[in-house]
Design a protein with these regions (language model features):
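Acidic, carboxylate-rich catalytic segments that either coordinate divalent cations
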Residues: 178-203
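Alpha-helical bundle segments that constitute or directly flank the non-heme di-iron/ferroxidase center
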Residues: 13-43, 63, 112-122, 194
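Short alpha-helical hairpin
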Residues: 1-14, 33, 159-170
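Secondary-structure edge/capping motif, primarily at the C-terminal ends of alpha-helices
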Residues: 40-44, 102, 125-132, 167, ...
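Active-site-proximal alpha-helical scaffolds that flank and shape metal-associated catalytic sites
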Residues: 48-155, 184, 188
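Long amphipathic all-alpha helical oligomerization modules
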Residues: 150-183
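Inter-helical linker of Solcar repeats in mitochondrial carrier family
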Residues: 18, 109, 175-176
């Protein structure tokens, strides 16, 4: 909540170059994020799980095309820049860790790898908007905050949380500790992501 990237977005002072770099890196992150869903689907053992996971995967891809790519174009990011962009090593480390946990664990493990990113963005956006309502009206960054405080995004998050709660009802202590470790590591990776885009995105 106190990271300069999000606080400067909230008051409209974040240099546009930093946000452009963030959007490109986030786009690359999302490409791996959907692969993690695909890895989890392979572990699903009934049609209901497959239906839920496939729906989440389709929603993520759809949101990328409906919102993320048009947003990048409004920022002046060209198709050439999008296709030539390469993930920063911190971005790679994050998604590779998530994918490894999803591939080597079960459905619950895979869903926990996804939880931090989804949940933390909603939490950060909500708290920032509570503290600084004008953030929603900022010409450059307002729609970013609006997306993460929207009812549809909250509903999607709650579905993920409910699914994790249902699957974790009978796990043992060792498994619970491992899942907590995954969540904590993903929190740290997310913080490093903010640090990375703030440092690499120009002055």
């Amino acid at each position: 909540l106190c990271h300069p990237f999000v606080t400067q977005m909230a008051d409209g002072t974040l240099p546009p170059e930093k946000f452009r770099y963030y959007m490109l890196q986030d786009y690359l992150y999302l490409k791996d994020y959907v692969k993690i869903f695909a890895a989890i689907i392979q572990k699903a053992d009934d049609f209901e799980q497959i239906r839920f996971l496939s729906g989440e995967l389709a929603d993520t891809i759809g949101e990328t095309f409906r919102t993320h790519i048009p947003y990048m174009k409004r920022l002046g990011i060209t198709e050439e820049e999008i296709h030539s962009a390469r993930p920063h090593m911190d971005n790679n480390a994050y998604t590779h860790y998530m994918l490894w946990e999803a591939q080597t664990g079960d459905v619950l493990t895979g869903l926990v790898t996804l939880l931090n990113c989804s949940w933390s963005y909603a939490y950060v956006a909500e708290k920032i908007v509570e503290r600084c309502p004008d953030a929603l009206r900022d010409k450059r960054y307002g729609s970013w905050f609006a997306g993460y405080v929207s009812e549809s995004y909250r509903r999607t998050n709650q579905m993920l949380i409910d699914r994790i709660d249902a699957l974790s009802g009978f796990i043992d202590e060792k498994t619970a500790e491992h899942l907590c470790e995954i969540f904590e590591k993903c929190c740290l990776f997310d913080l490093r992501f903010w640090d990375m885009v703030y440092a690499m995105g120009g002055n």
